[in-house]
Every structure is written in C-alpha cells, then in structure tokens.
From Swiss-Prot:
The lineage of its organism: Eukaryota, Viridiplantae, Chlorophyta, core chlorophytes, Trebouxiophyceae. It is a multi-pass membrane protein. The keyword Transferase does not apply. It is found in: Plastid membrane. The chain crosses the membrane at residues 43-63, 89-109, 132-152, 155-175, 203-223, 247-267, 293-313. Disulfide bonds: none annotated. Keywords: Membrane, Plastid, Transmembrane, Transmembrane helix. The keyword Ribonucleoprotein does not apply. Its main location: plastid. This is Uncharacterized membrane protein ycf78. It comes from Helicosporidium sp. subsp. Simulium jonesii (Green alga). GO terms for cellular component: plastid membrane. It comes from the Eukaryota.
Amino acid sequence: MFLVYLRNCMDFFFNSSFNYSLTSIDFYKTIFLIFANKIKNNFLYIISFQWFFNITYIINQLPSIDDELYIPIVRDFFNFNSLITYIYNISLTQIFSIFSFSAIHVYFIKRLYSENLTSILPALSGYFISEILFIICIYSGITNLFIILANWERFFIISGIIFFFYEGVNFIKENKNKNIYLKIPFIKHSTFFNSYRFFNFKEFFLGVFLFCLDSPSIFTLVSNLSLTPTVSNFEFFINSSFIQLVLFILIRSFFFYLSFIIIYPFILNKIHHNTYFQSDTLKKINIFIQKGFGMLLIFFSVSSIPFYTIEYFLGYLLGIIPKDISLFFTQLDPYFLSDSPGFYEQFYYGNTVVPFKAAKFDRGRYLLYPAYRELPPSYEDFIFKPIYLEWTKTLKSNNYIDRYLGSQKTTMQYIQTKATPIIKFFENLFPDANVRKSNKRKKILTQLLTDKFLGSHTKLNTYFNVPYAEKLLFFNRLSKSAFRINNKQYYNDLILSSIEEFVTFNENLIPNFETLTPFDKCTYRFSLSKNLLTSRLKPFVDFLDLFSAPEFDITPIYVKMAENILSTYDRKKFFAPLANFFKDETLNESKVKKKNAQPSLSREIEAIQGKIPLESILTEGIVALFPEWAYIKMELVGKLGSIIKEYQRYFNFLEIFNLYLRGHSFKLTVKQSIDLHYRQLYQTEAISYLRHYFNNNSYRKIRDDLDNFSKVLKINFIENTKNKTNKIKNLNTREDSKKLLISLEKDSKKFMKYLLFKTTRSFASKVYNHQFKGTLIDLIQWFSYSPYTSSMFKEINTKEMENVFIEAEEPSYLLSLNNDVKKYYPIIKYDQAFYKKDALDKGIIFDHILYKSLIEELYDDDLTLENSESLKNENKLSKKNLSLINSNIISPNQNIFDLLNMIIDYITITNYSLSKIDTLLNPFIEYMSFEPLCASNHNNLFVLSTAHYSINDIDLPVKNHNTNKWPLPSNILDYLVYNISDDKVSFKNPLAYIGMFLQIPYEKFGIDYKNTYIFKVDNYEELNEHEVFDQYMDFFARYEDPAYESLQLKFINLFLENSLDDTNKALCKNYLFSKNFMVPTAYIDCPFPILQHFYLAKNLRQLFFVRSPIRGGYKWAGSYTNNIINNKLYTDLLKIYNRIILLWHKIYTSIIYKFKRNNHGTLAQLVE
C-alpha cells in the first residue's frame, strides 16, 4: 500500500551514486535508518545472493495498491566477478556518502566544543530556517527546489567532501596539542542575547549552505510529507494539517539542538574520564579518539541514534508518518513501460513535476525513466522476467489465454467494447480538462475501467494494458487545473444517461432477458445500476464529490434512477393501494408526475409510528404490480439461503420504491433499516453474522433480546426443554422421535413470535425485525431438530404433520401429497428465470423451456434435454455433455450426502462450457445465483436425523457405511487411466476427466455405490503432512499432461490465499492432510455451487472458490484446477462445512433450550 509512498522516502538520503537502495521499513525500521548512514542498504542484495552489478536498476511498472512487489532473479547468480564489482562500486559510493552527510556534523561539533554554544546559533538558525522554507515550498507545490537539488546533487556531494576535509584538518590542527576536556555547556542569558554571533549573517548563510549539503538526508522528511501518486496517500496528504507539519519541524529542531548540547558531550565526557580507559592499550584508543577522525566516527555514530529515533517517534505520535508500514523492500525510482514514448511529457512524482525520458525497450515498448537519472548503461541485458511473464507462459500452455482472452490486442478490444457506454460518458464529461487528445483519453479511460471489468485481484490489468500511472496522471492533471464542478445537473444527467446505456448494453448480453418476470427485470436493473455507481463509477463519484462545492449529492441520481425504472410499469396499479392508504383519491399517475404532489404527512407519521400497518400496504402494492409476489410471501420462505435471496430481492425493490417516493416529496423512508451496508452484512454473510453477533456492539440490541428471552419464557419452559433434551438420548422408537420433534417445533414458534413481536411498534422497527431478527429466526429454524418449521407449514394440524413425517421415507413422497399440504411446501425461488408456477405445481423445479434455450446457446443442437438421458444410459461421456436434473424430489429428512449422490447422477457440467457461460451471463451471474441448478429441497439439507446424531456429538461416523481412504485403490486408478478407451472419451485436457467417476463400475471393485458416503472420521493424531502431499503428487504424476506442471503451485496457493483468515487456513490444513480421506462416489465440475449452503459463509466460500486469474472474482474451484484435486478438495471442504454446521447446531440448540449449566449465562460465555 505504501510502496510508492516510501519509494522516495530515503532517495536523496542514501542515493548519492544514483543507484537504487532498498530499505527495510518494518519492525526494525528505526535501526535500519540508524545504520543506513554508515552501511548502504544495497548490501541487502548481497545477503539475498543477488549481486548482479546492475541489479540496482530494477525495472518495474508502477504497481497498483493491491499488487505485490516482485524482485526478479538476476542472470549472474553466484557470479564471483559480479560480486567483487558490485562490492567495489557500493563501497566507493558509501565512502562519499558518509563524507557528504558528515560535513554538517563536523562543523557543528568543531564550533560547539572549540568555542561555545552561542557560536553555532547563527548557523543552526540558517540551517533550520532553510529546512522550514524548503518543506513549505514542497508542501505548497513549488517544485523548482526539487529539480535544483536533483541537478546540483553532484556539486553538493563534492562540496561536502571538500568542506569535510577542510574543517576536519583545521579541527585537528587546532586541537593537536590540547587535552580536550568536554563539558556540558549551559546557556547564559547575557551571552545568549548579547552575542554578536547571533546576528552574524556570514554564519547564517553558512548554515544555509550546510542545509544544501545535508539535503539528501533532509529530503527524508520532505518525501514523507509529499504527495505521492497513490489514492491512499492522496487522502493521507490532504488530511495532514499544516499545523502538524510545523509542529513536527519545531520539535525536531529542538531535539536536534538538544542532542548537540547534552547527548554528545555527556557520552564523550564519560568515555574520557572512565577509569576503564586508563590502561595502556585503551589510552592509545583514547588518544585516537581525541584526534579528528576518531572523534568523527563517534560523533557520526552517536548523532544518528537520537536524531532519527526521536524524529520517527514524533512522526508516529503526530500521525505524519504512517504506522502500518508493512513492506520489506522498497523501490526508490519510478521506471515505467509504455507503448508510447511521448506520452510522459511530465509526471507528478510526489508533489513535484519530474520530466521523463524514453528509451527503446523490447517488443516495441519504451522504458520511461526520470530525466534527472542516468539511463542504465546495460538495461537491454536485464533479465526482465517479472512474475507475470512466467505466469502468462503457464496459462498459455493450458490454452487459458487463447480460450478466454486471446492475444493482448484482443484483450484490449474486448475491454474497450465492454466499456463503450462508460467511455462515451467520460469522454464528454470534462470539456475543460487539460487532456484533449481522444486517443490518450480513451487509453486512460480504458485502463481506468480495466480493474473493474477484469477484477481487482488479477495481474492482467497491470501487464496487458496501459500502465497504472496513466490513470493517475489523468486525475493529477485534472486536479492541477483547479477543476471545480458548478453545473451539477449536467453531471447528474450524464451519469443517468451512462447508466441507462450501461444497463441496456448488459441486458443485451443476457440470453432471453425478455422472458424474465417484470419483478426480476426491475430488481436486476436497479441492482446493476447501483453496482455501477458504488463500484465501477465510485472513483469518478468520489472525484466529483472532492471538487464540487458544496458536496456532490448522489441521492438525486438514485431517485431519478428509481423513477426511470418504475416508469416502465403501471404506476397506477402500483400506487392505488398507497393512495387509498393516504386517503388521497387524486393520487394517480398524472399527479405523481407533478413535483408539488404531497399526500397527508400526518398519515405518514402515523404509519411510521406503527399505528397503521404500512408494511401490509407496501406488500399489497408490490403484489398488485408483480402478481408472483403473492406466490412467494415472506412467511413462506424457508431456510437461510433462500431468505437471504428473497430479502435481497425484496429490499432491492423496496429501495427503488422508497427512492421513488422520496423524489416525489412523500419522504416515506424505512430510515436506516434497509441501509445497504447492514443489508449486505446480514443477508450475504450469514456465518460472519454469527461470528460477529456475540462481540459487536452494534448487535447489542439483539443480544439483549435474546438474554431477555429466558426471562419472558420463565422457568417452566426451561425445565420442559431440559427434560426434552435429556429424552433425546433415550429415543427408542420413531414414534417417540416424532412426538418430540413436534413438541420442539411449538417451542420454536414461541421463540420466533417473541423475536418478531416483542419490540417497538414502528414501521422501521418492523422492518428491522424482519430483516435482522428474521435472519436470526431462520438460523434457529435451520439448526433446530425439527425437519419442519413454522415457515414451512403455516396452519397444518398435527395429524397432517404426522402423515407427512411418516411418508417422508418414500423418495417421491412430495408427489403423493395432497394439494392442501403441497401449497405450503416451500419451493425455493432464487431466480424467476428458472421457475414457472405450472412447473412448480407438477413438482418440477426448473423452467425447462427457458433453460433449454440457454443450453442451445452453449451446446450442440443434438445435445438437448430430450436426449441427455439417452447419452447417460449409453455410458458415453463427452466434454460437451450436460445432463440436467430430473424432476425427482429429495426427501426432506434425507442426509445431505444422499442428496449429493442423487444430484451427481443427474448433472454433469464440464469446464468446456465455462467460458461461454461466463461471457453470456456476466454481469448477470453476479446478480443471479445459479444454486437452483443443483438443488431441490434446500429447506431440509441440514436436518440431522436423531437416529444418527445427538446434540453432544459433533463428529459421529455414519454406521454401516463403507469408506475408503484416499488416494483411490490402485485397481480403480488403473481402471481410470487405462480402461477408458479413447474412442469413448478424448482427454486432450485433464479438465475433461471431470465426471469420469460416473463410469467407474464400483460393484466390480466391491464398493457399495449407494452406501459410499463422504464423511469424516475424527482422527488427526500422528499427522504426516509430507507423506500425504507425496501421495497427491504421485497420483498426479500418473497422467502425462503438460497442464499438471502447474498443479502443485495451484494446489498450494489455494490454501495460501491472503484473504483466508488463520482459523480457516488451519482448519483447511487439518482436513487436507488428514489420514482419513473418504472417497467420493462422483464429482461435478460446475461453474456454480452444487448445493445451496456453499453460498452462505463468506470465509468458507473462499475455500470453495478460487480467484479467477482471468476475470477476477470467485469461480467454482473446479474451473481452473484439475478435477481430481478438486474431487478431493470438494470432499474435504464439504466435511469441514459439515463439522461447522454441526457445531453451530449444537450452539443454537443450547440457546433454544437455555443454558445447560445455569440459568444466568450469556451467549458469549456459551460460545466460549
């Protein structure tokens, strides 16, 4: 983050030889700064065995904020001649650097102890006044001083050397026959105010000259405060007040002065008079110290310690120098690669303008380097192989680049095509900006948008496109032109028109978009528009906000956006219930369009206060406009995954509705209850919500409600639940189990009613309850024992529940249910595109008509829904094969592994389709989740049968199930490798092995296919990671394919993702290297999650998904790695998730039944 910020931090301080220097700015930052005065940090290269002579000229692009810094490996590795040459050069450099830097110390020390304290006051005054003026000039943007110092650096170095020897020789001569006795000088008032030397302008200008000599070191402070070309440091710079700067300089000057009058003489006095120095040998040392060079070394060493320690300590306290500097190596000079040699007429380096020169580089590109630096003499011989070259080589070996992006030119065309609406918007945005050439602007804007289109985690945006610096140059030039925004409406209209173009552009990418329901169209358009504003256009909106006076208000854009979206629908129909509610019969479409239309605000106030059921009115209006909402009411939504999706859809539309009313002066809001941040927090990060729930102050209200819950239900309920909990261990018959579950269901209803209604009665509170506590309620339902919840069966009597429970043993039980029961059955409706009411009534989950049209876009004409089953029966596997889920419904009380096995029999989506799916549905796929492709009855995925589990058992192996350790037995491996003939399957790419487990005749090897479960046995003792890893590698080696070369790296990197926290990383490692790997019966490589629960937890989701190196974002893990490794990965992660689910099941069961040990515990204690 602070890479560029630190690059010029020590530039002039260290780099007298015009070379790079690397400095460690981390835990030992201060120590490195101390010794950097004497030992040049280029020695770090020698320590790291990188002593190539020209390694100091590392050429690298200016990295973006999220990029890592890579140090290339030099060509002459362990070359002795290069080592000698390198040491020779930096040694000479170091000697001259020491002499130049020490000049000021020699002068001040000589004057201080040869005469008195006041003799150096004029020089000190000139020195510090020069320093303050210099920093003020830099702070104010006066950049000429920087250029002067850069161009005269050699002169100051030579002057410093001459001055050093001149003053040093005089000092030795003057003290040759004197016994130097150092005292701590004190300031005498008469001497201080009356000394003529205080007004000695000759000494004053000598101090100014000493500042110039010391400018390489003083530039350390300046560079810390200067504006550097990164967004983060720009924010840091404008937040640093000028008072802080002046205060820092004054305190720094005081300690600098204090170190001369107290620290140095005190130390030297102790050395001189210590009896330990009276031996003959040490007397000689003492004599040497009294001579010039010996004193210089001591003064030089001691001076840097208090000076820089105090300086950086004060910088920490004042907040000027950042505290969280985490980089270990830092580059100090900007070198860039560009396709255009003349683009960099000037570049803002810090707060200064630095001219750049261009030199020919390879592949028609140009090396741009600062004009005040010399071109490396042998730059053409550099080993310019950063990581991205090796990385692209690996990708090309697997045909990923050709498949997804093609050549560099194709990539740029692809980005420019996708960014056309926004580029058009930007090109018309700044008519008065100081950037006029359209080609340059298009190049800048393309790069500006590349990070968002290709993803923020990919390196392609850095190396396949224009340098990052061009984007910064664009904004810097705008800022230097004192740009101000006056006509806000003009920019509002531009943004809205751009959004409309962008939405229309993306709608055309979605197949069969017109077949979507009006509700899905509406919410999709709004989500896409809001995403555009909050992510892809956020830098621009922030820029408008920064340069507009008063602040740029984005609310009118949202309001207008919502109005445009709603304008495509029948507003009379929608607002009719609302008009009746406000008793304003004249509220119709014509009046809504008038700006002055205002309903009765008193009725609005009553609604917000909860006196009128406004929420029901809103629901009525939504249902009137979108009839399908009558079919999906909130109380009918089942498990957590579906309620997340439905809440998202519901609140997205509610936000549109709210913004529309706000634009028409209704001022009807749901306050902060549907704020975007909290909605995302609670709806899309369920497990994170559970984890933070116990320790975050913002959830105190919910936590207090839960604590009060025990008081409301009183002791009787607690005792009853305790007894019921104990009965679980003694269940003997299915009838006992059934009765207990029904009883527990009633208790759960009490708990849910308490959470829903035991609150304030305002409308905002009701939304709060539905949104936040409603999520908690579904979590409790999810982890309760009962396979049925109140959200599933609204008003079903006990007899009906008994019948359903008994019939649940039949796989096709749902088809035999009567209509009264079926209408309450919670079909999970993630996306309307895959559902139709008629199909649902028939028990079919998906809209095959729409899905079939999607398939025809992706696959051959002869491979459609009708013949997919015949392909399966013929035991043929094609890399274009796609078998859809049939209409069988999974029993609600079936184990999750049964569900997995049944799904595997019906769906196989190969990696071949991924590129087309990703292209056609992006960014549509960001809005719509395709979990329904592989899910049936999600409401009961994690209902745990009491026949196998109890609340006290987290890891219980399923009895009477055959398991096999990983790797697979050798006979099965041989079968896979040799017995699958080429005439049936052509494995040109190892990804085509996906689904081959479906063809294994398990019965032939004595494996019970139906009873082979993916389950984990809790045995982690005597863990041998290396042995297991070798087994993996041996297994990979059985297949001779070039793509396996990168498997090991991908395999390791998957578990070294920086985004994983330590807990998940350790948990993954335990499962990964466990000795008890279970063999999955089959595996699916699919661009979508197979099961609904994969979507729930953000941290766990990062385990199931890998970051795509092509477009960024999360993709199914099987998309970019081999199916076999994912086969194992999927198995392990499924077991990890199962373990966590069981753990939370235990926790929430304990919550429902109160706390086992006592009745006074807290939830935090329970979790501990």
